[in-house]
């Protein structure tokens, strides 16, 4: 892909910033807990994970955590890992801030900004143990496919930020999107499939709202796990 095409893809957002309803509890969490658990975007600042988490544990990045329920569950189940979640919608950010405070979660921090810009400008190369993208917007219409978060440009970006041996984990209930991602990764020499084709659903991945909705619609659930080599 030429540099100009890559630049055009970077400028296309994978999300639409909607003014969704924020509950009183969520707004109070945004007002009261953002200073403690929400990292502000700063283009010229690289995150020092040892400093912000106060340990040297592996860091897992989740892009698009929604309301945050599954990410909270994973952080609580894995106290020896650090989790950084990215979500652009205020309701989800407020919800997870409330949970972090009231469940006293020490290994989870969040950001609310474009994930690609965070990765490009604030995440050091080879610093992440895992990148998780669960049930991203599939942008069903062909004319909107270019908005999909997981494309070749971003797969290249993920590889830069993952440590050698780090894992990219993608899950979707939209098979055409999952097949596209699988093909891109299978043909990328920077990655190795940890399974043959799609992975079995990991028991440790919590059930999400979008996964439940997909199951109710009889959509097949696809997990993909690739290791950076």
From Swiss-Prot:
What metabolic or biological pathway is this protein involved in?
tRNA modification; N(7)-methylguanine-tRNA biosynthesis
- Kindly give the InterPro entries that the UniProt entry links to this protein: SAM-dependent_MTases_sf, tRNA_(Gua-N-7)_MeTrfase_Trmb, tRNA_methyltr_TrmB_bact
| Gene3D superfamilies given in the database record | Vaccinia Virus protein VP39
Q: What Gene Ontology terms describe where this protein resides (cellular component)?
A: tRNA methyltransferase complex
Q: What segment(s) does the record annotate as region Interaction with RNA?
A: 143-148
Q: Residues that bind S-adenosyl-L-methionine, according to the entry?
A: 62, 87, 114, 137
Listed GO MF terms: tRNA (guanine(46)-N7)-methyltransferase activity
Q: What is its EC number?
A: 2.1.1.33
Q: Which residues form the active site?
A: 137
Residue stretches spanning the membrane: none
The UniProt keywords, alphabetically, are: Methyltransferase, S-adenosyl-L-methionine, Transferase, tRNA processing
Functional summary from the UniProt entry? Catalyzes the formation of N(7)-methylguanine at position 46 (m7G46) in tRNA.
Can you say what this protein is called? tRNA (guanine-N(7)-)-methyltransferase
Q: What is the lineage of its organism?
A: Bacteria, Pseudomonadati, Pseudomonadota, Gammaproteobacteria, Thiotrichales
């Amino acid at each position: 892909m030429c540099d100009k095409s890559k630049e055009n893809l970077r400028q296309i957002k994978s999300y639409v910033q909607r003014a969704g309803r924020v509950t009183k509890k969520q707004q109070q969490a945004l007002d009261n807990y953002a200073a403690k658990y929400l990292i502000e975007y700063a283009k010229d600042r690289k995150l020092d994970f040892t400093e912000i988490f106060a340990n040297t544990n592996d860091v897992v990045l989740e892009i698009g955590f929604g309301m945050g329920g599954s990410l909270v569950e994973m952080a609580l189940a894995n106290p020896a890992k650090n989790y950084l979640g990215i979500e652009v919608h205020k309701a989800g950010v407020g919800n997870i801030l409330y949970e972090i405070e009231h469940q006293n979660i020490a290994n989870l921090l969040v950001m609310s900004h474009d994930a690609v810009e965070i990765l490009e400008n604030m995440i050091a190369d080879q610093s992440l143990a895992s990148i998780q993208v669960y049930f991203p917007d599939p942008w069903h219409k062909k004319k909107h496919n270019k908005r999909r978060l997981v494309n070749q440009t971003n797969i290249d970006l993920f590889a830069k930020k993952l440590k050698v041996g780090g894992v990219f984990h993608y899950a979707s209930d939209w098979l055409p999107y999952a097949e596209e991602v699988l093909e891109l990764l299978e043909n990328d020499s920077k990655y190795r499939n940890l399974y043959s084709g799609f992975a079995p659903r990991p028991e440790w991945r919590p059930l999400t709202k979008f996964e439940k909705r997909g199951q109710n619609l009889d959509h097949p659930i696809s997990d993909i796990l690739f290791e950076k080599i």
